[in-house]
């Protein structure tokens, strides 16, 4: 008995050591925001917090150098993105108090006891409004800014249309519009590029999973599409050619998520995220569903983005009615301008969004 206990303890100790040396083990404590001398900024916030939102425990990271700054609610795409800030700093926390919320079923908010099919679009929209209300109350601000990325834009724009009085402005990064048409355009692009490259293996994989307006996206297509896009530099980031090295490893070595939370990041990614709503996403034309908004609207889009179509987002921008609107093309970005071109993103937010202007926007 003692020998078995000693053996188990030794295995646990070795396992713990390997986790530490690999960088996977972490305390999960948010890093403080400090000055040049390493002293914590007195008015700053850097914390992980959990709330009961519409009956479900949900988590978020709050970061800001001064709690009196404007509040920015950041709504992620297919999976939470806060961990990326350790490798790809955004600087958002220097201008805003940023709420990196892990929405229902994702990351900190993942709950294996809640079946994905029970999570509805209506719940996502209601949760966005509940988080906005929490932030408004906690930081004593009448309104917050809402920034959404990729799949998050599908929910966020509908929340803005429903309750514009809660928000100063909406920033859509890689805005979804007509996602089925976006997937069809991407499929045609990928087939053309891999045929030109003479990559018959990838070409066969793509041709085995054709995307059509009539039949949608077949089983297995999205995994092939992701690998094909990243090889061409038109996936998550223009300079990212592998999800493993560009996303998975940064998530597993993040110091601000515990090991268990890191595992929940990926469980949520594969079982919840946008996928339970994929059929609804493909069937929805947001340009028809939300033809106008009552607050300033800003679209940030990478020209190399083939996850959410750049041309379709621009067409929507041209047609949508808003009191102020601006479209910003990022020439060095694919799907994630805030991580790929953070300085320009921050300048747009600081100079245009906060002032309700479009001086830095694209010109005809």
Per-region residue spans from a language model:
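Glycine-rich "HGGG/HGxG" loop immediately N-terminal to the catalytic nucleophile
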Residues: 82, 105-119
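Short beta-strand element of the alpha/beta-hydrolase
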Residues: 68-78
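Catalytic histidine-centered segment of alpha/beta-hydrolase-like enzymes
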Residues: 333-342, 346
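Alpha/beta-hydrolase
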Residues: 197-288, 295
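Conserved acidic catalytic loop of the alpha/beta-hydrolase fold
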Residues: 123-143
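Conserved alpha/beta-hydrolase
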Residues: 92-111
